[in-house]
């Protein structure tokens, strides 16, 4: 049987007989002696096969090739001084092989090199198609090991220090669509009826609070049928938590200690506490985003009142229609950003327009401190307005001022996107920085112009601020999101626990009494049986691991992810099923393949 893992061996084991299992990372023949790097999930160790010492093992080593699965028995020896490898944890030792047994060979050409010694860049589609090979590589091995350490740190903190208990909630549940589309599962036993895969354990964890389990957590699988991007997956993992009898401040404090524990345990990083806070209004005003990246400046400045009566209709018209005019100041932007990049066809212009802006206006601050204006802005900006713009933006000579004008939503989205683009483009972001913050005081609801109704900004179970109960359409929510380097890693709230308030919220978002009863009657009924005050939070575990590993894509934090087309390239899921299977489920497909036009 195995005595050690490859990556465990150190100088202390010199003279020890060992049995190792693993994969051939690479094989080298040097002057009649064969060297093999043997790899398992803990690392690699060098195997030596010398024909003068062990002819049999040498003969076996001659037949080894990359990725063969082998069992090796031998003795640990110290490396000669000239062969020490300080880059490897096992670099002080090597194993003189007495016996090599090939457990399995590679019978096809490898689609890419797996060896840790090979830094080959491999196309992502190929990596996902042969994911079992990709997971053998150092990068993905490290990522999944770190993911395991994160989960272990979470469990130890919540259970050992905070008395949480882990409870599993159903995966087959009821469809209550309020956000993304549900993944639906037909019931064979109950024809014509459907389960839904949970978008979160939200309702069940609230019911656990009603049940008296006052500190619950779960590493939960969740499912959302939504458009994908680099940091989203159709199935994902949450750290889900719920607590009774705690205030918002107490929940935030507990979660700061949890996050600090994770970073200390997994990365050895001491996080300063308390984390900074911004209200939703402050975040949107200063950054145009409710998940701002605060590793760099470039804060937005609202000048709507300054240009409201300006003759330039793009600005004044935006303000009169209820929108905004904001400036994104770029220090030293005159030297670093040309006009071509801001005008149609330029990369900065493209960033703004792809976020919905019609374009970008701009002015430059000359070296003498005066504003250099162009076109319609030049003809319509008074000296007083110029002076006020300089005062508010605190623009120094050489500063470029980019304007966004239009609806508040479009201005915020477009300038936020330009800000993020320039933060990277101008090298303003410290890649080692970890900027955590809370965003609080979100609106309870937002207006959906297409459907002509209010929608819950988070979800309809979020408790309104007690001071704002008179009008829920303008109420602040007792909600809190935690943001790391511009990405939301978690979000939560205090929950409604009184039936009358919950029914008012349902009414505010356009649910009739009958609809609310049909969808959430079981929850409303539970509120009649002594529901405690409670609140919670959920973290995107995949996204948190992505940030901790420094990866750009959430797919590199997951063992077997889907593509951005929601496909598994390894198993070729989703796939057709037989007519017999559909018939058993009383399901018929109405989908028809598109008709190809003839040439």
Curated annotation (Swiss-Prot):
This is Aspartate--tRNA(Asp/Asn) ligase. Signal peptide: none annotated. It comes from Synechococcus elongatus (strain ATCC 33912 / PCC 7942 / FACHB-805) (Anacystis nidulans R2). Its main location: cytoplasm. One of its GO terms (biological process) is aspartyl-tRNA aminoacylation. The gene is aspS. CDD domains: AspRS_core, EcAspRS_like_N. GO terms for cellular component: cytoplasm. The keyword Transport does not apply. ATP binds at residues 224-226, 233, 488, 540-543. Residues 202-205 are annotated as: Aspartate.
